[in-house]
Every structure is written in C-alpha cells, then in structure tokens.
Amino acid sequence: DCYIAGLQIDSSASEGAGIYVDLPGGITLQKSTLEEAVKAYGEPVDRFEGEKEVLLTYEYGMYRSVQLGFAKDTGILARMDMKNMRNTEGMDVASVSSNPTEEVQNYTAPEGPGDVLGDFVVEYDGQFYQLPTPVAVFEKNGWVLNEAESDYAVMYGKYGCVTLEKNGVKLYAVVNNYGEE
C-alpha cells in the first residue's frame, strides 16, 4: 500500500469546484481570505503575485511545504498544494508488494484538526487525515481508486500518482511507496 504524501486542489477547475478542505486555524478552501490565512499561519516564506492569483508558500523542511493560492478578484482561497514527502517514523524506504506495510496497518487518523499548518492535518468530508496517509484509509472512508487515471504500481522508494473518486469529486494525489518488498 502507498501513502498519499501530497494533495493538490484547484477549485477553479471543474474537478475541484465541490471540494472544501478545512485546515488548522479555521482556514477553509473556497471560504477563507488571504488575510485570515496570514493571521493564522504568519508571514509565508514566499509571496508571489500573479495576474489572477496571490500564492503564499510555507515551508517545513525539504519536500514539506504548503502553497495557498488566493483568487485576486475575490481574495478567497481557491487553490492548495500540500506536500509532506517524508518517511514516517521507523520506516525504511526499500519494493512493490500488495501486502500492507506495518506503517499502513498502524496508521491512526487524527481525532481533530492540527494545531499548526505544519502538522499536515486536513479535514475533508467529515474525516481528519494527517499526511502522509495510507491510500487504504481514503478507501475505507468511501473513496474509490480510479485505476485508469492512476499509476498501476509504484516501486519501493518511488513516487507515483493516484486519482480517487467519491460522490462525483476527483482527488488527485501524489503517493510514495515506503514498502520493503
């Protein structure tokens, strides 16, 4: 089994229009403003102002970042890209197997929101997830793997992509295979 180590959601695309994600600090995709995000998370390490969007970047180490995109015309959080590409504690990156790893079997979902954005805890559809999250956890919560739009297999120590679907909504995710076989 693989972990989802990143989420990228763009509410301006038809696939992301119905996705509302709650982040720590009371920030919600498609509802919160840039000012609310800066108040909740502090100043970003980078702020880019494009033609249609203001993009804030928060970094929490190598391959661990959150980008929040706010529509210039509304000031509302319209896009998010979270990546937490790290090995979970005690995990050795090593081959492809259909057997769930010990880390997948021992994953415990958070019971509530994280305290800070760098906790990588999100709430979606009434469920809390802490990235990286096993794909199987999303499947247990009603998400279905779209095999046609997902990598067939991800070799150990490598990254791949999966598409999960639920109630007509698509979630595109980056996965990392932490298995040893």
What are these regions (language model features)?
Residues 7-29, 41-42, 49-51:
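Non-cytosolic head/periplasmic domains of membrane-anchored proteins
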Residues 111-142, 146-148:
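N-terminal export/targeting and maturation segments
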Residues 20-28, 120-128, 161:
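Second-shell loop/turn segments in exported
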Residues 20-23, 45, 104, 110-112, ...:
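Generic detector of short, locally flexible boundary/turn motifs and exposed helical patches
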Residues 1-6, 32-109, 136-180:
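A cross-family detector of function-defining hotspots
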Residues 30-31, 132:
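Short gly/acidic/polar-rich coil/turn motifs that serve as flexible hinges in modular proteins
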Residues 12, 16, 99, 106-109, ...:
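Amphipathic, alpha-helical segments enriched in basic
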